[in-house]
């Protein structure tokens, strides 16, 4: 269909789903992850990628949304998800055998129009059928990249039409022989880099300790790409083991940054209350 942008078709406010982190919602510029778009979250191992997605699912469910989790890594922990506020009994969970099956399920969920958010964990685990049925040591050059490229070509139109948020979790690999620039790259070829409206780079910045006991990680997220607001903004928050994102700690940090809360040494004060 062809439309004339003469003002009769007003640009509606972008619908978003909160990430569960106030700082990251602000860094994204629109208040969360945009619906009707593809989002990629990537980073090293144990950096908080799945935790961030589960926090976002919990926020979506709080607002009455329907969510699906495609667990290609076969590592979904319902006990941990429940601790983060996810209503596991209301979550659609799939653990597919092949990459083709995972992406077909994703396409079916999106086309149904009955799901608000779909998470695919992870792109690296989307193994093509030919590779699974082949022998160990067989070479399958570019198979996964072609699979992702074909799937995203099919998906994007349906995603926009049904206003579904699709989040792909991705892992980092090292390029061999890179002298200048970063040797890091993400798996699954270049298609996802192009189709994603938002790309988030999540990293551990340090540890949170109480004596010798490690309670969690200081986490830094950089918005590498953003088609809906200015990119390259950053957010920092704490992820506590078994609890998820520390909302209270983040709120205090933002309050200090904007001179709403006074910090003096280890003391915080607000309106003469310490």
Curated annotation (Swiss-Prot):
Q: Name one GO cellular component term.
A: cytosol
Per the UniProt record, the source organism is: Neisseria animalis
Where ATP binds, per the record, is at 43-50
The UniProt entry's sequence similarity note says:
Belongs to the RecA family.
Q: What does this protein do?
A: Can catalyze the hydrolysis of ATP in the presence of single-stranded DNA, the ATP-dependent uptake of single-stranded DNA by duplex DNA, and the ATP-dependent hybridization of homologous single-stranded DNAs. It interacts with LexA causing its activation and leading to its autocatalytic cleavage.
- Pfam families in the record, alphabetically? RecA, RecA_C
Name the record gives this protein: Protein RecA
Give the keywords, sorted. ATP-binding, Cytoplasm, DNA damage, DNA recombination, DNA repair, DNA-binding, Nucleotide-binding, SOS response
- GO-annotated biological processes: DNA recombination; DNA repair; SOS response
Where does the record place it?
Cytoplasm
Which one of the record's GO molecular function terms can you name? Answer: ATP-dependent DNA damage sensor activity
Keyword Repressor applies:
no
């Amino acid at each position: 269909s062809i439309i004339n942008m003469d003002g009769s078709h007003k640009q509606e406010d972008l619908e978003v789903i909160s990430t569960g982190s106030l700082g990251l919602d602000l860094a994204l510029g629109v208040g969360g992850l945009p619906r009707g778009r593809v989002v990629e979250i990537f980073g090293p191992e144990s950096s908080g990628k799945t935790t961030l997605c589960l926090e976002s699912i919990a926020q979506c469910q709080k607002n009455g949304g329907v969510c699906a989790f495609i667990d290609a890594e076969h590592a979904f922990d319902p006990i941990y998800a429940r601790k983060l506020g996810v209503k596991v009994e209301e979550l659609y969970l799939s653990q597919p055998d092949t990459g083709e099956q995972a992406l077909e399920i994703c396409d079916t969920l999106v086309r149904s129009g009955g799901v608000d958010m779909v998470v695919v964990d992870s792109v690296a685990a989307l193994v093509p059928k030919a590779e699974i049925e082949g022998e160990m040591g067989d070479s399958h050059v570019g198979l996964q990249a072609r699979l992702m490229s074909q799937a995203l070509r099919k998906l994007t139109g349906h995603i926009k039409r049904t206003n579904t948020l699709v989040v792909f979790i991705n892992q980092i690999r090292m390029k061999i022989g890179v002298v200048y620039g970063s040797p890091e790259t993400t798996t699954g070829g270049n298609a996802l880099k192009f189709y994603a409206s938002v790309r988030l780079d999540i990293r551990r910045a340090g540890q949170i300790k109480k004596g010798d006991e490690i309670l969690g990680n200081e986490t830094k997220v950089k918005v590498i790409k953003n088609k809906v607001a200015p990119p390259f903004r950053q957010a920092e928050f704490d992820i506590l083991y078994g609890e998820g994102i520390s909302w209270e700690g983040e709120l205090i940090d933002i309050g200090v940054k904007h001179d709403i809360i006074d910090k003096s040494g280890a003391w915080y004060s607000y309106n003469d209350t310490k």
